[in-house]
Design a protein with these regions (language model features):
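Surface-exposed beta-loop interaction hotspot
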Residues: 115-158
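A glycine-rich beta-to-alpha transition motif near the start of alpha/beta enzyme domains, typified by
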Residues: 1-111, 143-267
Length: 267
């Protein structure tokens, strides 16, 4: 049995466990499955956070990228006074994270945690139209299938439906989300996310990268600049900001993050 220090965060839903002690890469999937289980801490995902390096390093349980986990990491970094510097009344820094080729920006300001989201370098920002109300958005570290709920109703067996969509559309990635959405009268999503290494499928109560994927899909990758609020199954919104400065385009997600527990877990 090993003892692992942890934080549990809720970034707009999407309960996330962040482990602060080293866990070998080959053990992370097994440890994550235990921690997420009903008989343990329970969560929708697990990340492994190294506060001792610069920039601070976050490795997700399956090597995927997760924007909400980056926001949760920013909240922990602020609480631990690690890796962030004062800036215009808030805190800013960088985070090295699995699934992203370069460090991403994080900031804590105005009661919200922000995470920069890596964008595809390809034309159209990884957005592909597959059919009426059906699109694919390939982001670094995760791909999302976007489905208009009016044309593609949310299924009772969401895990089976998500598996069928991945197979039929031949979507290969470390993590794949199926994002059922509605755009009117306001944007809302029902995200189902599968992670390859843990063989886990969750109907997530919040999904930051899925919210970004929806914003890109609705604008076909061309809607810069944009500010969009996307309602999550938790009942909380996640904000998406798309910025453009000359040829440079950036994307951020933002919203409150609640740190609900910290302590030691026995695995």
């Amino acid at each position: 049995m090993r003892t692992l220090r942890f934080y549990k965060a809720v970034p707009g839903g999407n309960p996330t466990i962040l482990i602060l002690d080293p866990v070998p890469a080959g053990d992370r999937a097994v440890v994550s499955r235990v921690l997420m289980g009903a008989g343990h801490l329970q969560a929708e995902q697990v990340g492994f956070l190294d506060l001792a390096v610069r920039p601070v390093r976050l490795d997700m349980m399956g090597g995927e990228f997760c924007g909400n986990a980056c926001r949760a990491a920013a909240a922990v970094m602020a609480r631990e006074a690690s890796g962030l510097s004062p800036h215009e009344g808030g805190l800013r820094g960088e985070l090295s994270v699995s699934g992203a080729e370069a460090p991403v920006g994080v900031r804590v300001e105005g009661g919200e945690c922000w995470a920069q989201m890596p964008l595809p370098g390809e034309p159209g920002l990884g957005v592909t139209e597959l059919g009426p109300g059906l699109g694919l958005v390939r982001l670094p570290g995760i791909s999302h299938i976007c489905l208009d709920e009016e044309l593609h109703p949310f299924p009772g067996d969401f895990a089976g439906a998500a598996e069928g969509l991945r197979t039929r559309l031949d979507v290969e990635a470390e993590a794949v989300g199926c994002i059922w959405y509605r755009a009117n009268p306001s944007c809302a999503i029902k995200p189902v996310v599968w992670v390859r290494s843990t063989a886990s499928t969750h109907f997530e109560t919040g999904c930051g990268s899925g919210s970004l994927a929806l914003a890109l899909w609705l604008g076909k990758g061309q809607n810069f600049p944009t500010d969009l609020k996307v309602l999550q199954p938790s009942g909380n919104p996640i904000g998406v900001r798309l910025e453009e400065s000359g040829p440079i385009r950036r994307a951020w997600i933002h919203g409150p993050v609640d740190l609900v527990a910290r302590g030691e877990a026995f695995v």
